[in-house]
Every structure is written in structure tokens, then in C-alpha cells.
């Protein structure tokens, strides 16, 4: 079983406004951030944070997709296992995904709409986050 949590969220703010909050040091983009040269524009961010209750670092990967007047954000958090027999992370991946989205919404001062939320996300459930 994969311990990952996925969110698909519409942030009611322009793409520029959303990517402006992705700065070095933010827990949702402190590993990697890139805006691709595509139309519509797409950005990728990777963050890492230590969770005491999981006893491990977790990562969050985000895909940001430009829309006309809003930005779609896919947040996938995972990595709370310490060994082969760990079958739970005490909700850490869920909390990291939600915390990352909540921070983006607060920093942009935008309203956000959760379109989908997927617990125990794995490749067989990835269709649920497709747009």
C-alpha cells in the first residue's frame, strides 16, 4: 500500500499570482521549482518537511496549471514510511498536502475550491486527479 495523499484544487487567482508565492524556503517548494514554457503555462514544485509523528521527512509534489482566471493545483504528498512494515503515517501525508494548499491560498489571499481528494493515492487512482 502506498502512503500518498492527493488533492486537486482550483485557486481563484491568476497563474502569476500563484507562482509568486513559490519562493526558496517555503515548505512546499524548498527542493525544486520550475515554470515550463508551455501554453497553458505549467509549473512544478517539490517541497520537503519533517513530520515528528511519522518520524520521517515527507515530500510534496505540486503541478500548477494555468486556467483563464484561475490556477489548478495538484498536490501529492508522500514519504512517511520508516520501513517495509509501515502501513500508516498517522495522517502526515494528508496533512502535508492540505497544509501546502492552505498556505498557497492564504499567501495569495484567494479562495480555493477542493475539486478532488484521494487517500492512499497510487498509480491505479491517478485518473482521479486528471483534469
Question: What annotation goes with each model-predicted range?
Answer:
Residues 39-46:
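Short, hydrophobic/aromatic-rich segments at coil-to-beta transitions
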Residues 75-83:
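Short, solvent-exposed aromatic-acidic interface loops
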Residues 15, 36-38, 64-71:
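A short, structured loop/turn motif at beta-sheet edges
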Residues 55-61:
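Short, surface-exposed coil-to-beta transition loops
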Residues 83-126:
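A conserved amphipathic terminal alpha-helix motif
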Residues 24-31, 80, 108:
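A common structural junction motif
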Residues 129-131:
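Glycine-rich, aromatic-bearing surface loops/beta-hairpins
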Residues 1-25, 105, 113-121, 126:
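Terminal, regulation- and interaction-focused segments at domain boundaries
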